[in-house]
Structure formats: C-alpha cells, structure tokens
Amino acid sequence: MKVLVINCGSSSLKYQLIDMSNEESLAQGLVERIGITGSILTQKVEGKDKYVVETPLKDHQDAIELVLKCLVDENHGVISSMDEISAVGHRVVHGGEKYATSVVINEEVIKALDEFTKLAPLHNPPNIIGINACKALMPKTPMVAVFDTAFHQTMPEKAFMYALPYELYTEDHVRRYGFHGTSHKYVAGEMAKLMNKDISDLKIVTCHIGNGVSITAVDGGKSVDTTMGFTPLDGIIMGSRSGSIDPAIVTYLVKEKGYSIDEVNDILNKKSGVLGISGIGTDFRDIRSAVENDNDPRALLTMDIFGYQVKKQIGAYAAVMGGVDAIVFTAGIGEHAPEIRSRALTNMEFLGIEVDLEKNESHNIGDGMEISKETSKVKVVVIPTNEELMIAKETLELVK
C-alpha cells in the first residue's frame, strides 16, 4: 500500500508518498507561495534530479492537483496511476479534547475541525482546506486526520489544567493541549526499539527542538506532561517565540507602553525567543557562527538560556515520572546543535545522566546516535524525527 501524506500551511503544502510495504519514501515535495505570485513546486525522488515546476496556483486544490500530476508524471513521477494511492494522511494541528487518536475523515470530523478553528486560527483552516481539496480530487480515496494534539490527550488533569476560574475550562476549553505529538510519539517508540524494551516499561523525556520547541514526559508510552500549552507559544524558548513568560508582562506592555494586543501577540510570536535575545535571527547556525567567530555576548547568552531551560525541564519531568530511563533529542536543533545538548546534559550525574562530550560534538549524527557514556544509567540518544512516516503508519492502521 502507498500512503500520501499531506501537511498544509496557509500558503504552502508539504507532501510525501510512502510505500508502506518497506516504509520507504518514494517522493517528497514542497509547494510554496500558494495563492500568491511566484508559486513553485519542488519534488525530490531518490536517484532522480530535483523536479521544479513554476506555475500559478490560485488555491490549495490547484496545488494538490499539481502534486498528483507530478507523482504520475512519465519522466519525473513514481507511480503510473492515482489508483496506486491507497489512502491520504493529513497532518491536523488541533483535535481539541474530542480526538485522542487519529480518525478516518467524514463530514462529522470536518465539522468538528471547523469548530476547533478558534483554538488554532492559524493552523486548522489550511488543514481543512487541504482535506477538502483532496476530497474533491480523490473522492474515493480514504482520508485520515492525524492530530498534533492527540498524543497528549493522556495527560492527567493535574498536568493540563491552568489555575484559572474553572469555567474557563468547562465553557471555553482553556487548558494545556500540547503539540508536536506525532514527533514525540515516533521518537519515543524508536527509543524503546533501540533499547530493546517494551515502551510500557520506560520513562522517557523527548526533546523536539527545532524552530518550535517542546519537551514531553512519556511514561509507559503515554504523554503525562508537555511544555507547549493552550497554544504552541508556551514552554521553552523557540526561534522567534518567547516560550513561558509572566502573563503580567502582557498587561504591562498594553497599559504602560501603549502596545495593542495584536502588537504584543506579534512580539511574543515573531520577535522574541532566539531572535529576540540574540538580535541575529532564528537560524541556530548563525548563532553558533556569531559565538565561534565573534564571541558575540548576546549569541552566547542565547545558547546559555536555551540549554538552561532544556536542562530545567528534563529535571522537572524526571521528578514528575519518578525517574528517567532515556532522553531523546530530535528535530533540527536537537539533532544538529551539540552546544545545546551539552549545556542541557552536563552536571546531571545526580540523575544518572553521563554525557560523552566527544560523541556529542558530532554536528551531523544522521540516523541516530547514542551520546551518553557506557556507564550512564540514563540512555541519551539523538534520533531524527519522521512525522510523515508516523502519519502514514496511523493512516494505514485505520484504513487497511
């Protein structure tokens, strides 16, 4: 069976076609600038030259139609007919409290996703548009929604509730939801395989550290706490997001400094985090370069804050679970920034964590590598995430 995985943004679309008989990616691509000038598709197939198509795309339906054409293209495609696509798995950011697992998409599901839009106004609308576009072009192909929030629905009330008036939860659904669930679930499962143990017997801290950052306590294969909250703004410092701050700062900026709510929202989401502290940008390679070449004090401070916050969260989740057996680092920074891993892991011997600094210094770990010492009671491993494969697996499970 071949599963097409779709991830729609507001003006972009990522896709991957996966052969589930061997879990190999047949083709992957990115469509950019949908609905604006300069629309472009870039498709990569193993053993073939990169295929680039520049053509106007007025909406996501146009984009998905182009994707399907490229997949069956005589010279650049990988399948002879769309009939070879057994199912489509859609990444959906927010499933609210209704969906604790992936679900086959029908009209009831689409209606529910629409209701969750108020919880994820930036992300769910393009997800829904992508689903509707696929349904129009592939009406007989089963579709599955795989939610970023679903994995975290196992969190207990004491972890997901905010200390706000209770009615804000019961009436307005204000609570911690958590995100990156597909990634956390995937790397926790891979960690259990590497340790040759049943995941139900393990306490794992998974650190998804990219432009967005979230850390999760996975106890017995279930998420019991996570750093992102009601929105993906909460938690650890991120590329341009602040992470957790004193909520009174918002009041101060509005009342004392005269900012509008929209301006504060823009500051917290787009002008803070790594960008805000360093003044350089969101790309961690630029931060590293500023430290190594210029000894830039703000770049160094950015690294120190980042590592400190990750360390603090690992310690907190070890306390929550009553210990920790393994720690996983994944996503762009987690996989390729040894400076952050070393800052997060040094002086943690009291928890049984002993990091091998020489192994850790590898910038390009590739398919995964243990960076803890042989004597370490806690296994620390870098595992590249594969959210697309996880989405495809969950899709196949529901439609086979």
UniProtKB/Swiss-Prot annotation:
Pathway: Metabolic intermediate biosynthesis; acetyl-CoA biosynthesis; acetyl-CoA from acetate: step 1/2. It is found in: Cytoplasm. Its cofactor is Mg(2+); Mn(2+). The active site is at D148. GO terms for biological process: acetate metabolic process; acetyl-CoA biosynthetic process. Its EC number is 2.7.2.1. GO terms for cellular component: cytoplasm. Mg(2+) binds at N7, E387. The record marks H180, R241 as: Transition state stabilizer. It catalyses: acetate + ATP = acetyl phosphate + ADP. Keywords: ATP-binding, Cytoplasm, Kinase, Magnesium, Metal-binding, Nucleotide-binding, Transferase. ATP binds at K14, H208, I209, G210, N211, G212, D283, F284, R285, G332, I333, G334, E335, H336. GO terms for molecular function: acetate kinase activity; ATP binding; magnesium ion binding. Belongs to the acetokinase family. Homodimer. This is Acetate kinase.
